[in-house]
Amino acid sequence: MCIRDSCNHSLAHKKDRKHFVVHKCVNTKCPYYLHNLNKVDKKDLKEDYGKNKYKLHYIYREFQIDFFRMDLNTLPKNASSLKFSKHDQHVMSLCLTYKVNLGLSLRKTAQALKDIHGICISHQQVANYCKTASVCIKPFVDNYDYKTGNVFTADETYIKIRGIKTYIWFIMDAAKRSVIGYQVSDNRGVGPCILAMRMAFQHLKELPKNFKFIADGYSAYPLAAQQFFHEFGDKFKFEITQVIGLTNDNEVSKEFRPYKQMIERLNRTYKASYRKTNGFDNIDGANYDLALWVAYYNFLRPHKPVSYTHLR
């Protein structure tokens, strides 16, 4: 039985967030509040607003969207077909090699095909080929069983779409270095974090023993973990190990800093390929570009930890 169950005070509507509404019990005689208050350091109680450093009252988040029912396999719109009218599959493979593997821009890819292979092709046709390839390969990449270990690490970074910040979420298996969850979103809320976690956990019936999920101090990760426990119960009950800041100020940061640096290096690797695009025109373009990059990173790119071979 939850301590809160013995309090009959109704919850007060406090805040409206993008994906949920925050309700709070403001009863100062609530057993949940008194239980937490007893655990507060006595020094903080003597300070003005000292107890405000802690979240003592019962808080309930009422989600307006069910992120556990949303389709993970969204595909880019308006992709061209694999029926070639002017070129063939060989030209398409050359476009993908220069654009994805070598990280060239669309225009430089078109220029490379003309200068090296004598093939005249527009940069828009290169983009169409990339979008078509993404439609074909994204379901495979998203649903592949990577046989994950018991340590996941996550982080988010941002890109620009028409000059506006858009966020990329990555979840990596620390043992195999594979990207097992990713998401493009126009916000930094808990919703896209849940979707990325769903992709990472989709082949697990329950969490492995000694499971660790390592992230930074951003609040979306603990909130997403709470929702997994609420949705699936004890089989997906886990705590977020938060590595905060740039220096090892505590034992947790000292022990788990290498995992945080691992996901930060992944961010830098992706940003290096993204930088040549000079941003995207729409979120569909960001989606297909990211899907192709994850496919390249997981299946084609040589990696130092595995003797410069690919991960799979």
Language model regions located:
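Conserved small/polar residues in nucleotide/adenosyl-binding loops
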Residues: 1-5, 309-310
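Acidic/histidine-rich, metal-coordinating catalytic segments
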Residues: 209-221, 244
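Short, positively charged, Gly/Tyr-enriched micro-motifs
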Residues: 29-151, 156-162
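Short cysteine-rich clusters marking metal-coordination/redox-active sites
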Residues: 4-7, 25-27
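C-terminal domain-tail junction helix/linker
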Residues: 276-312
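Active-site proximal helix-loop segment of RNase H-like, two-metal nucleases, encompassing DDE(D)
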Residues: 251-255, 259-282, 300
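Cysteine-rich micro-motifs
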Residues: 18-34
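Active-site beta-loop-alpha junctions of metal-dependent nucleic acid enzymes
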Residues: 131-132, 182-206
